[in-house]
């Protein structure tokens, strides 16, 4: 029997997760106005390409918003919070790349 929480831990599922700006605001507690401001500053990016269309966000950007909110709640400025979040993302991407390379080397 499959665990009912599996979809929430499944990277394929999370990559397909797309949420509108109103739902993101409800889920995260971040006001819509603030989300728009962060996007206007280039800190986050919606999947919406056309002007005037509802903004929609993927899991990565929602997670980014939550991390930014955490740093802001800890007293950091928005710019510093954005830098800290990007540093963490870069660290995880580099670590994941190294693990993939090590795995490929070990299977040869």
PLM regions and their residue ranges:
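Arg/Lys-rich, alpha-helical DNA-contact motif
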Residues: 1-26, 45, 51, 59-108
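Short coil turns linking two alpha-helices in DNA-binding domains
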Residues: 31-34
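Conserved active-site tyrosine of GNAT-family acetyltransferases
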Residues: 38, 57
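Glycine-centered, phosphate/nucleic-acid-interacting loop/turn motifs that mediate DNA/RNA or nucleotide
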Residues: 42
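Conserved catalytic core of two-component sensor histidine kinases, primarily the HATPase_c ATP-binding
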Residues: 54
